[in-house]
Amino acid sequence: VGCVELTTQGNNLGWSDAAMFNLNKALELTLNGGVDLITGEKIGPDYGSLATYESFEALEESFDRQLDYFIDRMIKACEEVEEAHMTLLPTPFLSAVVRDCMENGMDVTAGGAHYNLSGIQMIQVANLADSMAALKKLVYDEKKISPERLLKALQTDFREDELCRTILLNKAPKYGNDVEWTDELGAKWAEAFKQKLSRYTNYRGGKYHTGMYTVSAHVPMGE
């Protein structure tokens, strides 16, 4: 579909890039009580902060709830966009060459195609695994960095604690470097995201499919 997404020919309206979901942003909000570290605005629910989670498992539980909250908001936004497409921008010429639209008497934007898929892209899987691994090892297991210290360092972008940044860079395991439990953290949350998304049906009556983007999305979403 124009770039890297796969689709079938002549029978599918595959909105393959319906949304991009920034996993690390959800983790940032988990650590900071729902407050955006860039703007200072509260944009997510407050399930606690890094200073209040007594265990790594408690942090993961809060992160899981943040995912639920923002996935639901994302789906609502996708539905509004799809409704606008159907109402304001129907595509009769495209519908004429897509299987089942003529038979159903429905435009592709209204769900007339044989298949009606929407793709949601997970962004920052590797960065999420790195972040989770650093939290687990250095904050909770080995206690080399206190929760309060790391939270303050994050809130000030490490300007006042370069040593904390150095410890994170050099002492935390990294995704994709044959550290099995770190790679498993990435796989765990990618699977969790996919399962959460599978609960929803898109506006055209089809399924949401989960993808992963790298390169073009990691840099702007990490800024």
Q: What does each model-found stretch correspond to?
A:
Residues 1-126, 130-223:
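Conserved catalytic cores of very large enzyme subunits
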